Each structure stands twice: as structure tokens, then as C-alpha cells.
UniProtKB/Swiss-Prot annotation:
The keyword Ribonucleoprotein applies. Belongs to the universal ribosomal protein uL13 family. Pfam families: Ribosomal_L13. Signal peptide: none annotated. This is Large ribosomal subunit protein uL13. The gene is rplM.
């Protein structure tokens, strides 16, 4: 018996909606990353993008445990000397709540062209509304 390898043109992709309200950041991010990779499917192939589309709503209401709300820092660099910037979780949640989930999930995906293709299937929204109703997404409980 030969090992099954999924072909990119035969992969079927579904759309799912995840409500992040009251959920812990790491626990929701690991499940989203796994679904984006397609590891929940029997036809999973590591070098083929077999994952589904994920829509995350209520990103502004995601939680972290312990003192991470005040202590967890996010860093960015402009590329110029002395150009490092830092912002903590609370301020980033008030300013750009989508970026918190995007950054957590992106770090869990493979690096390179395949990981970037997987990341493009993630849609994150701060509020409860999204504009993907035409895709008829299913609700995913995490």
C-alpha cells in the first residue's frame, strides 16, 4: 500500500467561525494554527496546504492568565539603529486587538511560503461582525 499524498487541487476547504470572547489566548491560538495547517483532516500532508479558513470574532475580548495582561510585551523594530518599540498586552488590546491573535497564530505556523499561505486563510475581527457571510461559515467550538 502506498502512502497517500494530498494534491493541492483536490483539497476541500471549509470556513469556520471562532468566537474568542472569554477564551485564553494560547489555547485558542493552538487550535486555530492546527486547523489552518489541516492537521485535523485524515488527508493531512505536511508539504501541502490542506487547512481550512478560520474567521475569529471578538478578538478584543480574548484573555490571558496571571499578570501577562500588564507584563506581556510585544516588540517591533523599524530596521534603524535604536528603532525598537515595545507595547504591552493591555495597550495593544486597546489599540489593535486583531494583532494579538494574528501574532500568536503566526508564530505557531511553519516559516516560509507554505506558512504564509496558511496564514492568509486567517481572518481576525475585533468585534462580533464579519463580512464573510457569503461563505456560510460553520461555528467552531474551542
Amino acid at each position: 500500500m502506498k502512502t497517500f499524498t494530498a494534491k493541492p487541487e483536490t483539497v476541500s476547504r471549509d470556513w469556520y467561525v471562532v468566537d474568542a470572547e472569554g477564551k485564553t489566548l494560547g489555547r485558542i491560538a493552538t487550535e486555530i494554527a492546527s486547523r489552518l495547517r489541516g492537521k485535523h483532516k485524515p488527508e493531512y500532508t505536511p508539504h501541502v496546504d490542506t487547512g481550512d479558513y478560520i474567521i475569529v470574532i471578538n478578538a478584543e475580548k480574548v484573555t490571558v492568565t496571571g499578570n501577562k495582561a500588564a507584563g506581556k510585551m510585544y516588540y517591533s523594530h523599524s530596521g534603524f539603529p535604536g528603532g525598537i518599540k515595545e507595547i504591552n498586552f493591555e495597550k495593544l488590546q486597546a489599540h489593535k486587538p486583531e494583532m494579538i491573535i494574528e501574532k500568536a497564530v503566526k508564530g505557531m505556523l511553519p516559516k516560509g511560503p507554505l506558512g504564509r499561505a496558511m496564514f492568509r486563510k486567517l481572518k481576525v475581527y475585533a468585534g462580533a461582525e464579519h463580512n464573510h457571510a457569503a461563505q456560510q461559515p460553520q461555528v467552531l467550538d474551542i
